[in-house]
Amino acid sequence: MFRRIIDRIKEAVEYLMSSRLIVLIIVFCLTSSILIGRLFYLQIVRGEDYLENYELQIRKTRTVPGTRGNIFDRNGEVIAYNELAYSVTIEDIIPTDTKTEDKNKILNDTLDSVLSIVEENGDSVIDNFGIILDSSGSYQFAETNETSRLRFVADVHGKSFIDDLTEKEKNKTAEQIVHYLCKRYGLDYSEHDAAYILKMVNMRYAMGLNSYQQWLTTVLASDVSDATAAAIMENQDSLQGVDISEDSLRRYPDGQYFASIIGYTGQISQEEYDDLSDDEKKRYSLSDIVGKSGIEHTFDSVLQGEKGKTTFYVDNLGKVTDTVSMTDPKAGNDVYLTIDKNLQISAYKLLEEKLAGIVLSKLSNVLDYDPSAEKDTKYIKIPVGDAYNSFIANEIIDMKKFGRTDAKPAEQAVYNTFTQKKAEILSELMAQLQNENAPAYKDLSKEMKAYMDYICDTLLKQTTGILMSDKIEAEDETQIAWATQETISLNRYLNYAISKNWIDTSKLGDSAYSSSEEIYSGVLAYLEEYLKEDSNFDKLLYKYLIKSGSVTGAQICAIVYEQGVLPMDENAYNGLLNGTTDAYGWLYDKIKTLQITPGQLALEPCSGGIVVTDPNSGDVLACVSYPGYDNNRLANTMDSAYYNQLNTGRANIFYNRATQEKTAPGSTFKMISATAGLEEGYIDAYTTTYCSGSFNTVTPSPKCWIYPGGHGALNVVQSLQHSCNVFYYQLGYNMGIDSNGNYDSDLGTDKLRKYAAMYGLDRKSGVEIPVSYTHLRAHETRHDL
C-alpha cells in the first residue's frame, strides 16, 4: 500500500518537473517570500519607529480670491479701495469620523480660547449673525423685514426654501433659535451670559456654512491688531486649525457721504448664490465677497478679480507639507464715476447745515406740544421734549447701559425713575386687561391710549402675529367699535377676537387651551412676560417720562457725555447735573455746531437729497442722500447690531432720497410746461401774463410764492427767471380749454405728459443704482399743473 503511494508521488513529481508551470510556481514562491519578509520587517522589526514618525498626506486645492478693483471719482480721487489686514481664520481639520459630542467639545474649547485672545487684545470676533442683543440684553432678529427673517430661519434649519419651514419653525423667536443652535453645537447657554453665547454661536454658525467643504477657512475675526496676530501664532499648537491670514479688506474713505451711491460688500448669501445663472455660479462660491448694494453690486462682475488656485499637501495636523502648483490671482478692474468727490462732500454738508437750520428755527422750549391746533403747517413747532426723546428712540444713547453696575450718576438716576414707572404701568395695564368693565379706549388718557395701541397694533399684530390681521373682518361691528368708534376696551376686543378665531394660539407656546378663558389668560401671561423685556415698549415709556418731565432734558444731555457720544466737557457735564447749564441751550448749541446732527435726532425734517448734473453732458456730478451711514461697518464682515440700528432707525437711512424719493417735481417742471406751451402755440417768446400773486380764474385760488406781492407782467423767459407760479397756472389752464371753450383737465395733462415723455421723464434715468420709476399721473387736478 505504501509502495503504491510512493509510486504515485514519484509520478506527480516527474510530471510537475516536466511541466512549464514549474517556473511560475518558483517565481510565485520567491516573491511571496520577499513580501512576507518585508512585511515582517516593517511591522515587527521597525513598526514602532514608523508609527512615531507617521505623517498623513492629504492633497487639497484652495482658491485665492483676486483683489477687488478700486472705485474712483471723475478726477481720480479714491472712493473705495482695498487694504491688507490680518484675519483670524479656522479650518475644520477634525476627522469626520469623530463623535459629534467630542467634536463639539474640541471646537468649543478652541473657539473659547480664540475669543479670549481676540478680546484681551482689544479686538472683536465676527458679528454677522442674523440675531443680535437688543438694548435690554435680550435676543432679537437683526432683520425687521419678515421675508428676510424667514430666509434666515430657513438657513438655520437647513431648508432651501421658506415654504419648507413648518409653522413651528416659522414662529420661533430669536431666543428659541439661539437655544436650538446651542443644542446643536453642544453649548450650555445656562452657564454663560447672552453676549458670550451669541459670540460663540456666531463663530460656530459661520463654520457651519463651510461644513460641506471643510478645507475652506472661516474668518473668526477680521482686521485684528498685531498683538492679536502674534498671540494666535504663539498659541497655534493648541488651537487646532486656527491661523492668521492676510486678507484684502474693503475701505471707504469719507464713507457716509458716498454710502448711498457706493453701497458695500459682504459674503454672498445662499439666496444671492441661488439667483446666479449657471455660468455665474462657475465664477462664484459661497465664501466669496460680493457687492451687496450700490455701485459695488451693479459692477460686481467688473470689480471682481480673477481667482487663483493653489494645490498642496497637508499632514494629519493640517500643516502644509508641500505645494504642488500655484496660479496667481488677478486683480479686478477699476471703476470711474462721473461723481465729483469734493462736490459730493460739499453738497452733503450744505444739506446737513440747511436741515439743522430748519430744525433750530422750529425748536421750541416746551416738553409736549399738540400740532393739530395750528391752522398752517408752517407754524408747527418741534417741542424740545421730542428732541430729548430722540436720543433714546433713535439710539444715540444706549438705554441698556443705564442699569449696569458701572452706570454713571445721570444713567443711574434715569434708570431708577424708569424702573419705578415701568412697574406702575405694567401693573395698571394688567389690571385693565383683566377687568371686564375696564374703561373704553376713548376714555383713557393719551399716554394709556399709546400703551394700548402698542400692545394691540404693534405687539400682537405686527411683531408676533398673535392677532391675525388677515382674519380680522373690517366691517365687523365690534371691530368698528374698537378701531373707529373707540367705545370698547382692549379687554373686550381681545375676548371677542378669541371668539372669532382671530387669535393664533400656536404662537403663545406649547400649552394646549380648551376654552376662551384659558386662551385669554395665555395671551395676558404672554404679554406680561414679553413687555418686561421689550425694548420698544421701554422706549415708549421713556417718551412719556420725558414729556412729563420725570426724566429731564439735563439728565439726557448729561448721559451723552457719560456714554462718550461727545467728548467729555467737565464744565458742561457738571453744569447739566447741578442745574447751572440749561439743557435747551446746550442742545441748541450742539445742533447749531453739528455736534448733534439732524440725521441722529431723526426729527422732521431729518432727510433730503441733492442731485447736481452737468447740463452740457448730463453727467451726474453729485448725488446726495441725507442722512448717510458708515458703510465701512457693513463691508467685509457686517456689524449686525449697527445694521439693525440703521434698519430700525426713524431716519430710514437705506432709502435713497436722491433716486428713490417720489414727490411732485415743483418748479423744475416749469421748463416742460414752457416747452409744451411754445410747441403747441399757446405762447410765444413775447406772450406775457400778469402776476398779481394769486391765480383768480379758479376757486380756491392758488398763490404764487411771492404772495401777497406779485411779479407783474412776465414773458416766458422772465417767468423762468423768477419762477412765477401764476404764469404757469394760466398756461396750464389755457392748455386745458377744449374747442367749446370749456376747461378739461385731462386735455391739458395729456399735452404735458407728451412733453414730459419727450424729456425722458417717463422712464428711468439710467444711473446704475436703484431708482424709482417716474409716475405720470393719469388725472391731474389744476393744482398739480
Question: What does each model-found stretch correspond to?
Answer:
Residues 333-338, 602-608, 641-669, 685-689, ...:
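Short active-site loop at a secondary-structure junction
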Residues 626, 634-637, 663-725, 761-771:
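Short, glycine/proline-biased beta-turn/loop segments that scaffold the active-site neighborhood
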Residues 352, 675-682, 730-734:
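Short glycine/serine- and small hydrophobic-enriched flexible loop segments
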Residues 328-332, 652-660, 701, 709-714, ...:
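Flexible glycine/proline-enriched surface loops and loop-helix/loop-strand junctions
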Residues 774-783:
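Conserved small/polar residues in nucleotide/adenosyl-binding loops
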Residues 93-115, 588-589, 637-666:
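Short, solvent-exposed cationic patches
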Residues 1-591, 599-609, 615, 628, ...:
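Membrane-proximal periplasmic segments of bacterial cell-envelope enzymes
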